[in-house]
């Protein structure tokens, strides 16, 4: 793996991390204070109509296009690129789906 590919993967990870964090935040997540609303599950329970995660999922899907382009069409495969894509995909899953699965 070249140094250029390493730097591009790091930049891609930082941009993807910030974009996923921005688009996955609930509108009223600032209300978590520990007194009345203790966690994200309480926010979802009290404010169900303000859930905008479906728009965030669609807005963040293009983050995976560079990985698909390099890995599938250009045949540039390296362990660091796979690790970066796996980390981004894991964070994407956590922010949009998994952290809400245990709210019963």
Curated annotation (Swiss-Prot):
Q: Where in the cell is it found?
A: Cell inner membrane
Which regions face the Periplasmic side of the membrane?
27-52, 99-104
Which coarse location class describes where this protein primarily resides? membrane
- Print the keywords alphabetically: Cell inner membrane, Cell membrane, Membrane, Transmembrane, Transmembrane helix
The keyword Methyltransferase belongs to this UniProt entry's keyword annotation: no
Q: How does it sit in the membrane?
A: Multi-pass membrane protein
Q: Where are the transmembrane segments?
A: 6-26, 53-73, 78-98
Q: Which superkingdom, per the lineage?
A: Bacteria
One GO cellular component term noted in the UniProt record for this chain:
plasma membrane
Recorded protein name is Inner membrane protein YjeO
Q: Which Pfam families match?
A: DUF2645
User: Which parts of the sequence lie on the Cytoplasmic side of the lipid bilayer?
Assistant: 1-5, 74-77
């Amino acid at each position: 793996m070249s140094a250029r590919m390493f730097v591009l993967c790091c930049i891609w990870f930082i941009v993807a991390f910030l974009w996923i964090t921005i688009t996955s935040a609930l509108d009223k997540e600032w209300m978590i204070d520990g007194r009345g609303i203790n966690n994200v599950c309480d926010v979802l329970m009290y404010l169900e109509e303000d859930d905008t995660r479906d728009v965030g999922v669609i807005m963040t899907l293009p983050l995976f296009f560079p990985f698909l382009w390099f890995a599938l069409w250009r045949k540039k495969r390296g362990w660091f690129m796979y690790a970066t894509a796996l980390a981004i995909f894991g964070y994407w899953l956590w922010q949009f789906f998994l952290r809400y699965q245990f709210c019963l």
